[in-house]
């Protein structure tokens, strides 16, 4: 087999017909500036060709179900193995997909509970066991010699009635004696029973004395009793001691029954095991009392019930007042002071009790009717489910939230599945185990108490579970729970979960391609991730990792630096060799950072800020432990901490949502907190995330930043446009007039090929320009509108330099390091990091008030160290204008430049949620209990 992967003539996107040779069975890191062509080489060339070759080996029938498999623009690739891509874009948004299902740990857990689990009565009557006739006989024969016993078959258990038909059947079957409510009597002499009382009726099947030779008779009698008693038998030893057995998993006291234990019982995705109320989702859309009653200090008359405020109609205020008067509820007493009974009436209604309602509308219409009072919760729920109006449904939805299911308490399973425990009476059910962190789950399995027989069955299953949990632990995900919904995971988390699954598969000879697996990972956990990558390599696999992390680059066997610049300035192999060889390469920007010749400097001094704060008290959402946090304004703030320590919960779930509620009247409910102060010191909240700037190819940098409006104005003012009577709209590709109607302004035509991938070809009429020929005849400085859109930002900045209004907006795109993109580049082709910087550019050209609050969650995702240096200059411009910038970040180059650090921890999950350190980077670096401080110290010493 070849020992090299040889790529010849790669031209995908901006790649410039490159040739590169990469060693097989090694850990290879591909790096370079954002937009340099790393992903084009790794994913769009190497992985795409690996996938295409596999799919081509399938039948035409199978290929039609596998989607598009375009042949990448490359001359040849030799030495290619089957390829598996683990990127950040394929996170499942299915609410049924959890960490447990994605990693397949749930499959093994279900098997474990089906094989060694013991059901316990949900009503507290102890363990429920199922016994065969043979097992029951064996247990009875253990009784002491000469023990007198009678074998009873329970035919009626705690049921009202006279049960005459039961006695008739007993007599027909030839039985003589029965026990009724504890008293033995002949069937023929049974008195008439009270039909309003609960009764227990047992048939006396046999009477025996314990001695040698009774096994055969005992077996027959117990078998007959089980048949008569619907699977139950009672052994009465005549000394007030009874043994109750069942051949089903059924509680002998209350009758709670569990079906035969099999894996499907423990699946929330199967009707057999899922909770019947929430269908296995664990959540239900319910009316949220906090949204219905936002202020408990208000009275009913003052409008404490938000949905029934008299904004558009006086119907509900009239209904409420007349109902409250009828039922004697004080309309002028604050909600918090009303009795529980009065609150219940307001919320849930009066049941069947009616009151007289007289209603007159604004047009004079009168309604007199006796009706029950519905209650506001029932009213919202009914209107949400019954209305045909989208507007009404959306209004009602704004008072509802996805809350844990009241039946299964969020565990997703039915009572029968949740009654089964592993590890004895004090053991946990499968729902409780799924709520444990990975670290706690590992500890539980290590100390699991099982009988010798159970150990024999469970050992191979437990090994598989522990192996997978250990892999998750080793890639820094020890804080996650198996019940965590896959849709709530970050890109880095979901990628590392799939990475752990691949390690568990123990495949060899595979080509793995990973996209920044270190995203969201604290420096402390990075070593474990690198060890996991090396373990995959040592199994005989080739790993190509697109990465910017310095530690990962230095741990690689081979480093490929793509560049030298981004976009049209990139697409070449600048350096290819060992990390040490690349570090010595003077042409490589990556090499200069690795060797220390280039670095992001530590600021000489820190900003003092405005002296004002936003302070949150009592933050207690998720794992936050009732903490108080101050965010100083007018500073560059970094919120840090190990993965899972509570950073995103504090910033995204509480701070951001509370500010949005107060400033923007956002209805999204924030996480738990007691109070917040200082919001009056800011006037804008800007959340700059990595979501796309547009969902369609029609959105592009020019339209997003607004510069396209100015460019169209400019074209409309040209002499040619005035002569022809063209207005600004003529130069839009979104509306009829100036656009090409053959492709509706898209510039491309989609051709469906059925068994082959859909093909996109340039429009034959406009040749991809998007405009009709008449529009393209209008020129500004010898360029038509299509040629302007095809310009890179760098070229456009020079071209429009004499026009300040346009030049200023284009310069901001250049300032954030996106000079290589074209003005008309479709938004769908921009990476997350590029989209985030485009949003920053859009903010840069707006006039600053000096009171804005910017939030960025891991802005360094996808950025090279050189890109980070540019990003920091942009963020510093915001702060220098008096604004506040808050970043959630693990990158030490960003953290060391911050004015103020808030470090959470000490660990992830339940071991986190505390404020470990606050202050300048220098102050945090001196705090030994801070993991961030320990790593920061080394970076600060590089001054």
UniProtKB/Swiss-Prot annotation:
HAMAP family linked to this entry: UvrA
Keywords, comma-separated and alphabetical: ATP-binding, Cytoplasm, DNA damage, DNA excision, DNA repair, DNA-binding, Excision nuclease, Metal-binding, Nucleotide-binding, Repeat, SOS response, Zinc, Zinc-finger
Recorded GO CC terms: cytoplasm; excinuclease repair complex
Nucleotide-binding in keyword set: yes
Record's keyword annotation contains RNA-binding: no
Main location class: cytoplasm
Family membership: Belongs to the ABC transporter superfamily. UvrA family.
Biological function: The UvrABC repair system catalyzes the recognition and processing of DNA lesions. UvrA is an ATPase and a DNA-binding protein. A damage recognition complex composed of 2 UvrA and 2 UvrB subunits scans DNA for abnormalities. When the presence of a lesion has been verified by UvrB, the UvrA molecules dissociate.
C4-type zinc-finger residues: 251-278, 740-766
Name of the featured protein: UvrABC system protein A
Compartmental location: Cytoplasm
Gene3D superfamilies membership: ABC transporter ATPase domain-like, ABC transporter ATPase like domain, ATP-grasp fold, A domain, P-loop containing nucleotide triphosphate hydrolases
BP GO annotations: nucleotide-excision repair; SOS response
Description of how the protein assembles with itself and partners: Forms a heterotetramer with UvrB during the search for lesions.
GO molecular function terms listed in the Swiss-Prot or TrEMBL record: ATP binding; ATP hydrolysis activity; DNA binding; excinuclease ABC activity; zinc ion binding
ABC transporter domain: residues covered: 308-589, 609-937
UniProt: ATP binding residues: 32-39, 641-648
